[in-house]
Amino acid sequence: MNIYEETKFIMKKYNVHANKKLGQNFLFDEQALDTIANEVTLEDTIIEIGPGLGTLTAILLQKAKKVIAVELDPKMVEIISERFKMYDNIEIINEDILKLNINKLAPKAKVVANLPYYITTSIVTELIKANITDITILIQKEVAERICAKPGDKKAGAITYFVNYYADAEIVTNVSKDSFIPAPEVESSIVRIKKLPEPRIKVKNEELLFKLIKENFTKRRKTITNSLSQSIPKNKLLEILSELGLPESTRGEELSLEIFAKIADLC
């Protein structure tokens, strides 16, 4: 029985369907699953977010010291609890990952996840804030490209700058929408995020830095004198731009992380 057949069998056995509200799509592509689990070792504790039917979980249990499976859907918890009842290296938590203290789940862990598209940015943000140094996620391709873009690129967004400040991120490979049951409307990508020992640059006030970046990308087509007007008085902003040698017509989406940090430091 291949993984596709196994997935269909489990869905039929437990009479379950993917929950659209929870963004469930069950991955059955063996190569993609192996790629996601590729860097897991017997020394690792893995936090798996949204294990679903347990397809990836089964692989992780063979490779990791321990798997902490965090699943919101009680039906999926029932399924994986029965599937893996003979394993002593799994802990199953029926909860929303965003409501948990991630650092308390394990003192040192890697994260692996097939994330719901609608909540990807929130989860990535919380994982990077936590003491997680290694994150491998399967997410919507468009979001992956935004996360892995370079600050100043056309595809960049606020999440680009946030991730780039704390970590290195790369797209490992793309995954066809035909690799899922049911098939989503968009293509997916596997992204690997490695947190840096220290932030990429130094800034006096991180909170202000990310506030300015977020404000800018809510008005990304406007000049920086307009997009940052809520946080910085226009006269002060003009002084800062002059000091940095930037014209008033500059758009924030054109700026590097370093320039945003300098603006924040000069406020």
Name every feature range the model reports, one short phrase each:
Residues 1-214, 242, 253, 257:
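Catalytic cores of RNA-modifying enzymes
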